[in-house]
Amino acid sequence: MNREKLMKMANTVRTGGKGTVRRKKKAVHKTTTTDDKRLQSTLKRVGVNSIPAIEEVNIFKDDVVIQFINPKVQASIAANTWVVSGTPQTKKLQDILPQIISQLGPDNLDNLKKLAEQFQKQAPGAGDVPATIQEEDDDDDVPDLVVGETFETPATEEAPKAAAS
């Protein structure tokens, strides 16, 4: 090997200045995830308690629902602090409404009215559907009788025509 290559290799392994010990490779420092530990210690100071047996948490924000299934819920009522941890799923309110309608109380009545109005705006022909169904039902009704006319005479007239062809 020539001298230039050796000097280049020597410079890459030296971690300090002139006169320091050479290392074969640089030490890689691991970055520890202290964020979670710091958060847990802060929550412990606030005094949160774990709330068991919560199957689902829904956070409503405009027309979007952030849904947590089987989350870990911690709360400190005195500090008005709620911690919901888990994997969130963002869904539209219209998609999740049939599942959560039983959970909604009377305080959400205004929101339900707004949703109903939005559905009617999205489907403008929705109000006309009962009228069209009613017209189709009229076809199944028995026609009114006409005085002097029977069903037997048209049937006898059609029978010879069918036999001729």
From Swiss-Prot:
Taxonomy, superkingdom: Eukaryota
Domain NAC-A/B per the UniProt entry, residue ranges: 33-97
Alphabetized UniProt keyword annotations: Transcription, Transcription regulation
CDD domains associated with the record: NAC_BTF3 (cd22055)
One family name in Pfam for this protein: NAC
Keyword Transcription regulation: yes
Gene Ontology cellular-component annotations: mitochondrion
Region of interest (Disordered), residue spans: 120-165
Amino acid composition bias (Acidic residues), ranges on this chain: 134-143
Family: Belongs to the NAC-beta family.
Protein name: Nascent polypeptide-associated complex subunit beta
Species this protein is from: Arabidopsis thaliana
